[in-house]
Amino acid sequence: MDFAAFVAKKEADAARRSRSGAERISRARPAGAMAIGNDWTRRLFDGDFYVSPPTGDRPSTSVVFVQSKDGNTGATNPSALGGGETDKHVIYEGLSRVAADAVMAGAGTIRGGKIVLSVWHPELVELRASLGLPRHPIQIVATLRGLPFEESLILNVPELPVILVTIPTWAALMTPI
């Protein structure tokens, strides 16, 4: 599957997964936080999503950790971890990435897979554009064992910026001759 087909499939899947709002949670705006959202995300998330803006010369970071009811912290299908497809498209692949300059994952997440860490629902793609950001965030992949470049979509899309974080031994092995 080429990158254009991958993007079209992900966007179509996200568009089909619109759901009604999740369980209502009362949340106050954290001090100094920046509100992110549009009418669509506010309806599904029940309000704004808040992120900490960068301060001084330090970047802003957001970390998404998930845990299933049985205590599992990893899954091949993120929608299996709690809120189903709404959580997957609105939070996991949505609001947590929409304002990001970069998204980071471990090599196990992308190794041999057809994955790009981005937003896919048309409303989120539009929100990202309204924030003045490029279509896809920079992809950061951390690995201690290296990656087979030919097996990972994320490493084979010239217009997709990728930063690979590894140890010197593997950096030397992955450098083209």
Annotate each language-model stretch with its function.
Residues 2-69, 73-177:
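Active-site ligand-binding patch in enzyme domains
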